[in-house]
UniProtKB/Swiss-Prot annotation:
Keywords: Cytoplasm, Exonuclease, Hydrolase, Nuclease. It catalyses: Exonucleolytic cleavage in either 5'- to 3'- or 3'- to 5'-direction to yield nucleoside 5'-phosphates. Its main location: cytoplasm. InterPro entries: Exonuc_VII_L, Exonuc_VII_lsu_C, OB-fold_nuc-bd_dom. It comes from the Bacteria. Its EC number is 3.1.11.6. GO terms for molecular function: exodeoxyribonuclease VII activity; nucleic acid binding. This is Exodeoxyribonuclease 7 large subunit. Pfam families: Exonuc_VII_L, tRNA_anti_2. It is an enzyme of class 3 (hydrolase). Belongs to the XseA family. It is found in: Cytoplasm. GO terms for biological process: DNA catabolic process.
Length: 448
């Protein structure tokens, strides 16, 4: 009898925790081990050493946990976007009721459609001899001009230009912008290589882009790009992605660089024997470190296996996962607490600013400005009253003015000497007279 086939007469009432516990046991005991392929996403590697991620395909996804006792045996560095093949047990994370997979082993998934196409084209071109060492053209020791074929907005172009400028700022560079990802990108790359060969303005070309998934780099695995590189009269350095990324373009090119920056190093003029010795020592050191780490890792795996055989590891893993969950919530709570303290400090600073000398000066300045405005208003009022009184006095003066008399229709007559004529006996025929009226003067001569 399973959880879902109990009779009505014997119905069982569960708590949430007891239901989750029984579902977990049902999944782990009934399903057993499963194998599946998918793409890694949301990869998290906390300090506990466990890995948490999502495994997905085009239509669905499932949460996964891989505890450190198992992930130490993984021989490659997983990353988001990596296609993997995993061996897993179905389980349930009881505190949240999340259905999940407990991963026991993981390896790269190399049998996918793109990988198969890659291998088929690689074998076909190799059979034609396009990878033959005899076809490789040597790089110029003293290049006069370097051509770069990549995206004009990508990080790879910035990295290449930075290295070239640091090693030889006077070295001319020609950029042939192209698409490096998506539909039509392979044709765009091939056309850029053809354009560089037609112009013959460079004596070495760097063809590449920054890192990405297999799909992102696929343009450099297209046959048209491979054949265009092989037909190039100008030596080509392939610089696609990171050191672990390998494309068909790498096999056909005259030289392969692990990164765009490394390609700039290869074609730069100042590569010296001392630099080569340093690189050799660096590689020897890397190999020694890898050997040491490999031995330590093997020893650690051996001790881990021994510990797993002696302790109830599964229960410990469950508790550790729960601890990771609590730690995450604690970090969020601490963040909220720090935010609250920060706001409290801001409020205190604001209150202090209200009592600071600077604020007092600002307040006094405001009061001074207000009094200044009142004083100016009072002065304007006094001037207005004075102007009004002046206008009244002018009106009174106007009433006794000769001009006022003239404006009422009267006139004033003077002789040639300016003397006012009041009587008729003051003039005789022939005298010149000037009569003043309100809007001017009238000149006349006495006739009789």
């Amino acid at each position: 009898m399973t959880l879902f086939t109990q009779t009505q007469s014997n119905d069982r009432i569960f708590t949430v925790s007891s239901l989750n516990a029984e579902v977990r046991l049902l999944l782990e005991n009934e399903m057993g081990i499963v194998w599946l392929v998918g793409e890694l996403s949301n990869l998290s590697m906390p300090v506990s050493g466990h890995w948490y991620f999502t495994l997905k395909d085009s239509r669905a996804q499932v949460k996964c946990a891989m505890f450190r006792g198992n992930n130490r045996r993984v021989t490659f560095k997983p990353a988001n976007g990596t296609q993997v093949l995993v061996k897993a047990r179905l389980s349930l994370y009881e505190p949240r009721g999340d259905y999940q997979l407990i991963i026991e082993s993981m390896q790269p998934e190399g049998d996918g459609r793109l990988q198969q196409q890659f291998e088929q084209l690689k074998m076909s071109l190799a059979a034609e001899g396009l990878f033959a060492q005899a076809l490789k053209k040597p790089l110029p020791e003293q290049p006069k001009r370097i051509g770069i074929i990549t995206s004009k907005t990508g990080a790879a172009l910035h990295d290449i230009l930075t290295v070239l400028h640091r090693r030889d700022p006077s070295l001319p560079v020609v950029i042939y912008p192209t698409m490096v990802q998506g539909d039509g990108s392979a044709i765009s790359i091939a056309q850029a290589i053809g354009r560089a060969n037609a112009r013959q303005e460079c004596d070495v070309l760097i063809v590449g882009r920054g890192g990405g998934s297999l799909e992102d780099l696929w343009a450099f695995n297209e046959e048209i790009v491979a054949r265009t590189i092989a037909a190039s009269q100008i030596p080509i350095v392939s610089a696609v992605g990171h050191e672990v990324d390998v494309t068909i373009a790498d096999f056909v090119a005259d030289m392969r660089a692990p990164t765009p920056s490394a390609a700039a190093e290869l074609v730069s003029r100042d590569i010296t024997h001392q630099t080569q010795k340093i690189q050799q020592k660096n590689q020897q050191l890397k190999n020694a470190i890898r050997t040491y780490l490999s031995k330590r890792e093997a020893k650690t795996v051996q001790l881990t296996h021994r510990l797993e055989r002696q302790h109830p590891q599964l229960r410990l893993n469950q508790q550790q996962q729960h601890l990771d969950d609590i730690s995450s919530r604690l970090e969020r709570a601490m963040g909220r607490l720090l935010s609250s303290h920060h706001q409290h400090v801001e409020r205190i600073n604001y209150k202090l600013s209200l009592h600071s000398p600077v604020q007092t000066i600002k307040n006094n300045q405001t009061t001074l400005d207000q009094r200044k405005r009142r004083l100016l208003d009072a002065m304007d009022h006094r001037l207005l009253n004075a102007n009004h009184k002046l206008a009244l006095a002018a009106e009174k003066l106007e009433t006794v003015s000769p001009l006022a008399t003239l404006s009422r229709g009267y006139s004033i007559t003077r002789d040639a000497k300016g003397k006012v004529i009041r009587h008729i006996d003051q003039v005789k025929p022939g005298d010149k007279l000037v009569t003043k009226v309100t809007d001017g003067e009238i000149h006349s001569t006495v006739s009789e």
